UniProtKB/Swiss-Prot annotation:
A Pfam cross-reference name: SQAPI
Compartments in which it is found: Secreted
Region described as Disordered: 26-51
Name of this protein: Cysteine proteinase inhibitor 4
GO cellular component: extracellular region
Origin species: Oryza sativa subsp. japonica (Rice)
Site (Reactive site): 51
InterPro entries in the cross-refs: Cystatin_dom, Cystatin_sf
Gene Ontology molecular functions: cysteine-type endopeptidase inhibitor activity
Keyword Signal: yes
Length: 158
């Protein structure tokens, strides 16, 4: 009887391995567009790469995104002041576009419109467009401005 148990266990293990391999092969075939990345299924079976950027819909109505835009301008002003880079401050206008990416937290790529305070700046007080990247870690109640710079394709930049 002892000789039959290992054969039964071996058969079960072999079956588990075969099912796992078949399942993995089936998933790789149906994963779509190459890249071999992990995919997240959404309605209708269409997948997207986990960790990829997604557009934020209704940016102007998204209070969190608008607040992050305001935070990015305030933080930029604070950093300029601490480096003694002059008195020119930006005044937040609005976030005009945003993308969200899941990292260890949420990374927001924001396109922010802001004007120089005191309207008589070098561009006559016209809003300028800036790109900002902010990381939010809600469980730590933390927001960090990573970058803030004039948008490369902004028509108001000289």
């Amino acid at each position: 009887m002892a000789a039959r148990c290992p054969v039964g266990v071996a058969s079960v293990l072999l079956l588990i391995v075969l099912v796992t391999v078949a399942s993995a092969a089936s998933g790789a075939r149906s994963g779509g567009g190459g890249g071999g990345g992990i995919r997240e299924l959404r309605g209708g079976g269409a997948g997207r790469r986990v960790g990829g950027r997604t557009e934020v819909r209704d940016v102007e109505g998204d209070r969190e995104v608008q607040e992050l835009g305001r935070f990015s301008v305030e933080e930029h002003n604070r950093r300029r002041r601490s480096r003694d880079c002059g008195d020119v401050r930006l005044e937040f206008g609005r976030v005009v576009a945003a993308q969200r990416q899941v990292v260890s937290g949420l990374k927001y790529y924001l396109r922010v419109a802001a004007a120089e305070e005191g309207a008589a700046g070098q561009n006559g007080g016209e809003p300028r467009v800036f790109d900002a990247v902010v990381v939010v870690k809600p469980w730590l109640e933390s927001r960090t401005l990573l970058t803030f710079a004039p948008a490369a394709d902004s028509p108001n930049e000289s």
